[in-house]
Amino acid sequence: MDTTIDYFTKAFTSAWNSLDISPIESLLDDNFHYSSFWVLEEMTTAEQYLDYLKGKFATLRRSGSLVKAEHIPGKHFIILTQDNRNRCGIILTVNDLGLIARADMMPIEFCR
């Protein structure tokens, strides 16, 4: 398996653009953590995050909201745009096992 950051950011981009968790399911460490700048509590398992993301994607499909994810070669984050106006980034951290250890959603200004 490719373990470059581009491999992982492309998988996350694919998941968000297709509103389908399958591109990232096998790439998350069991002890994966997810945090959001806008939410106080952190998720602490891959299972918890994937369940959350399934629900999030279902809500986005039902609402008809347009979400676009962008992969930027060589960067450790993706950019999300919702309804052509709300932009944020998801920064990924990969561990020594070659799995995604965490994802942090935050304002795009914090992504570099």
Each PLM stretch: what is its role?
Residues 50-112:
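A beta-strand edge to alpha-helix "cap/lid" segment located at domain peripheries
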Residues 15, 39-40, 91:
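Short N-terminal micro-motifs specific to bacterial/archaeal maturation
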Residues 1-2, 46, 99:
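Intrinsic-disorder-associated interaction segments
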Residues 1, 34-37, 102-105:
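Charged, low-complexity, helix/coiled-coil-prone segments
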Residues 1-22, 26, 30:
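Short, low-complexity N-terminal intrinsically disordered segments enriched in polar/charged residues
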Residues 22-71:
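A solvent-exposed, acidic/Ser-Thr-rich amphipathic alpha-helical stretch
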